[in-house]
């Protein structure tokens, strides 16, 4: 939920935490909302009787949304889904047109692909990634960087990257391997190390970024502290913990500042009991929608 009350994709919360920004509903562009606005404009006669089409009308709306959301020196645009998905074609076309309008030298295309590892044959399979990149080139977009997601904690041999570089036409330094890490806060460190030369060339700034705070975050998340705190989270939507991800991540950061380890104990807002509240060190009562669980939240606040 953004500061202006919009319910958006979970990814927007990651951007807020990692970039230390407050985002709004303008930063989340949804096809359904754009189509609704297009239909409303057509019904109001704003197109003068023209036939409203995905190209150019929807693509123009997407480009306008990108411009309206842009407020910084660097603007990050993420297109969800998979290359070739029918529902995402208008967004791919819009971003192609966008790069031509602002200048190709001002755009850096990053394509994330998945390279599976087959345990039976003990080899990485790059064919799905090659096909995805061929599809992307077919839409008129040549990636500058290919981020290769793989399973396991070790990166594939360099031969895999070389194979992808040859098949895609991307420079070898533009192929970055992204294996699993034990904490998400190590990802910026990995990207800065692997992608530094490409970003320096793109931005014209070869000054190495100060990654001290990221190193501290990664160290905190990997470290085990002796002092432990149990926080009771009185929640309505306990079936999906990601609903409260911003809160749980904030609690972790607060605990790290006090060199402590935090354990989240989920308490159903509809079945709050004194016994459940008595076992925790502190209670957090987050916001919610509707009447369900309100009495339990009030009871939890009263207990404290």
Regions found by a protein language model. Give the residues of each.
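Flexible phosphate-sensing "switch/lid" loops adjacent to ATP/NTP-binding sites
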Residues: 1-263, 270-282, 288-290, 296-303
């Amino acid at each position: 939920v953004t500061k202006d009350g919009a319910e958006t994709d979970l990814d927007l919360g990651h951007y807020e935490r990692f970039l230390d920004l407050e985002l709004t509903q303008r930063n989340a562009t949804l096809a359904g909302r754009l189509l609704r606005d297009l239909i409303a404009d057509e019904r109001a006669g704003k197109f003068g009787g023209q036939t409203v089409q995905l190209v150019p009308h929807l693509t123009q709306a997407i480009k306008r949304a990108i411009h309206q959301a842009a407020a910084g020196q660097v603007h990050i645009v993420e297109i969800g889904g998979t290359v070739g998905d029918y529902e995402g074609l208008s967004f791919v076309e819009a971003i192609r047109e966008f790069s031509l309008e602002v200048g190709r030298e001002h755009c850096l295309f990053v394509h994330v692909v998945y390279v599976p590892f087959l345990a039976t044959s003990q080899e990485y399979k790059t064919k799905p990634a090659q096909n995805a990149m061929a599809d992307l080139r077919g839409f008129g977009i040549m990636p500058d960087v290919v981020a290769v997601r793989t399973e396991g904690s070790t990166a594939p041999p360099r031969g895999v990257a070389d194979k992808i570089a040859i098949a895609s036409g991307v420079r070898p330094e533009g192929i970055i391997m992204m294996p699993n890490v034990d904490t998400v806060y190590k990802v910026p460190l990995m990207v800065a190390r692997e992608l530094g030369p490409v970003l320096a060339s793109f931005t014209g700034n070869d000054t190495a970024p100060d990654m001290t705070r990221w190193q501290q975050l990664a160290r905190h998340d990997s470290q085990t502290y002796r002092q432990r705190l149990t926080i009771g989270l009185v929640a309505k939507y306990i079936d999906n913990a990601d609903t409260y991800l911003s809160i749980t991540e904030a609690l972790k950061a607060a605990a790290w500042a006090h060199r402590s380890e935090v354990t989240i104990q989920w308490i159903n807002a509809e079945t709050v009991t004194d016994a459940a509240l008595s076992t925790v060190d502190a209670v957090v009562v987050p916001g919610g929608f509707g009447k369900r669980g309100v009495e339990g939240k009030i009871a939890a606040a009263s207990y404290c």
